[in-house]
Structure formats: structure tokens, C-alpha cells
Amino acid sequence: MTEQALLLVNLGSPASTEVADVRRYLNQFLMDPYVVDLPWPLRRLLVSMILIKRPEQSAHAYASIWWPEGSPLVVLSRRLQEAVKPHWTKGPVELAMRYGEPSIEGALKRLAGQGITQVALAPLYPQFADSTTTTVIQEARRVIREHGLDLKLSILQPFYDQPEYLDALVASAMPHLQQGFDHLLLSFHGLPERHLHKSDPTGAHCLKGDDCCQRAEGAVLATCYRAQCIRTAEGFATRAGLRRDQWSVSFQSRLGRAKWIEPYTETRLDELAEQGVKKLLVMCPAFVSDCIETLEEIGDRGREQFIEAGGQELVLVPCLNTHEDWVQALVQLCSRAPQAL
């Protein structure tokens, strides 16, 4: 029987909190044309400007959440890899990061060197976006093509509405929901609006009306990040038995001056405090592993902002990380990954 390896891929992290390492990581991340979708000269100019001050600022943020073992995202991803191994009986389980180490190139070369010819590629992003899902797939294909590797890929599809994923979200969040709260904010990573327009296959649906995400279906839904985030939130809330007035959706991590998808998390934190919310739960379902965007942006800065605006307590619900239900769900989802053309 032919072995099939499983390659789990997450976003990545600097090698350390040193400014030089953070600058190197940010340069690789921001120079990805799927992330900053500008022509190369403009992208290089913009990234060079960002790299003047941002590495020092980001290094401080990383240092505030860094663990003795290293980057929380990388550590938690490795723990997930180890948790999955006993359940993936088809072959070895590798871990890679799209940016930084361990790299996709290194992982695929190791698998090819072991005589593996079939790989289930698992971008660990529940919702589709070119800046996450597509760039992982294209990087894997680049490595295979440029190094002449005899590898055939099966690719985990976005799983934003899959019952296994939603049930795992509910199971992981339920202990916090049961402790009582005034409101639940489901904060997803944001994207520039132009990314949604570019991924709309019709060129005439995304952001055309307040209910465009509710009306999205078929090919439009398959590539609309915002619509998929809303479907995740609705599926979670239904399974968790929440009333519609108990939760809302927002989008975080806005960068630069371009318009990003709304509502913004930083705006919602102030609004909810002003509306009298005292105990706020925040979940970040676009991330399966806790990282700087959850631990520092929400858990530290977001909490401080909410309390300064009049709230009393912000509870960050941990990501799925290595929750048993998530491990089982991930294995089931990857087992169904279709072979790429």
C-alpha cells in the first residue's frame, strides 16, 4: 500500500524576538505577492518603508508573548503535529511554515527523500484567502516543480463550514461560554477589500450591498473570505445555542491606509464597552493555533483597550490548538482531501 504523508502548514514566525530576525521574517511575509498584491517595484518600495520602524515595534510585541520554548505559534503547531501522528496511519506527519522555519521546501524534500510519493497538504486556515490558502499551495507546487520532486498532492479544502471543525470550536469554547458573559465577539483576521474584489469570480458580487455575504453561494462563496467567516460564526453560534443578540463578528489586524473589511475589531471593542458590556468573550476562529494576533493583539492590547473604554473583563478564548476534538476533526478532514489536478 502506498504511503501518504500529511504536511500541516501554518503561517510562520520569526526565529527569535531579535529585531534582525523579525525584519527578515516580515520581509519574506510582506514581499509575498499574495499578501501585498502590488507590482514588484511598488511592493518593494512599500515593504522597505514598513521595515524602517515595524521590525522594532513587532519585536517588542513578540517578546511580550514569547515562550521559553520559542514562538507560541510554532510550539503549538509542533504539539499539534505530535498529537496528530498517532491518528494519521497513512504515513509520516510533517510540519511546515509558509514563512520562516520549518519551511515547506525542507519538508517536501525530506518526504521525497523517504520515498514518499503522495502528500496530503493541509493549509491550516479554515477560511479561504489568496494570502493564506493560495500562497501555501503555490509554494508547494513551486518546490515540487523547481526541484523535480515526484510528489502528488491532495489538498485540504477550506473547512469553514464543516461539522467536524464547527463541533470542535464549540467543544473548545464551551467551558468559557458556560461561565457566563455579556457578549461574544468573533474576531477574524482582516483583509483589504481589494483582495475580496480580486477573488470574486463574477467581478460583480463582493461588497455589492449590505447582505452580499449572506447571499453568496457557489463559486462566489468558494472564494469569498468574508462570507466564509460569517458562515463560520453562524454555524458556531447555532451549534452553541446562542441567541443572535449574544454575538457579533469583527475583523482585526488592519495594516496600512487601504480600506479593509469591516467592522473593525478595534472599533467594536470601544462600541461594546460603551453599550454596557462588562464581560466580553473574544474568539479568533480564523486561527487554529494561538499566535501574536490572538495573544498580543487581542489578549493584551485588546483587553487594555476594552477596559479603558469602560469594560471590566475581556476573556480571550484559546484557539483550537491541540484540543482532542480538533485533532480528530483535522485527521478526518485531511483524510477526505481531494487529489489536486
Swiss-Prot record:
<dbReference type="Pfam" id="PF00762">
    <property type="entry name" value="Ferrochelatase"/>
</dbReference>
<dbReference type="GO" id="GO:0005737">
    <property type="term" value="C:cytoplasm"/>
</dbReference>
<feature type="binding site">
    <location>
        <position position="293"/>
    </location>
    <ligand>
        <name>Fe cation</name>
    </ligand>
</feature>
<dbReference type="GO" id="GO:0006783">
    <property type="term" value="P:heme biosynthetic process"/>
</dbReference>
<dbReference type="InterPro" id="IPR033644">
    <property type="entry name" value="Ferrochelatase_C"/>
</dbReference>
<keyword id="KW-0456">Lyase</keyword>
<dbReference type="InterPro" id="IPR033659">
    <property type="entry name" value="Ferrochelatase_N"/>
</dbReference>
<feature type="binding site">
    <location>
        <position position="189"/>
    </location>
    <ligand>
        <name>Fe cation</name>
    </ligand>
</feature>
<protein>
    <recommendedName>
        <fullName>Ferrochelatase</fullName>
        <ecNumber>4.98.1.1</ecNumber>
    </recommendedName>
</protein>
<keyword id="KW-0350">Heme biosynthesis</keyword>
<keyword id="KW-0627">Porphyrin biosynthesis</keyword>
<comment type="similarity">
    <text>Belongs to the ferrochelatase family.</text>
</comment>
<keyword id="KW-0408">Iron</keyword>
<comment type="pathway">
    <text>Porphyrin-containing compound metabolism; protoheme biosynthesis; protoheme from protoporphyrin-IX: step 1/1.</text>
</comment>
<dbReference type="GO" id="GO:0046872">
    <property type="term" value="F:metal ion binding"/>
</dbReference>
<keyword id="KW-0479">Metal-binding</keyword>
<keyword id="KW-0963">Cytoplasm</keyword>
<comment type="function">
    <text>Catalyzes the ferrous insertion into protoporphyrin IX.</text>
</comment>
<dbReference type="GO" id="GO:0004325">
    <property type="term" value="F:ferrochelatase activity"/>
</dbReference>
<dbReference type="InterPro" id="IPR001015">
    <property type="entry name" value="Ferrochelatase"/>
</dbReference>
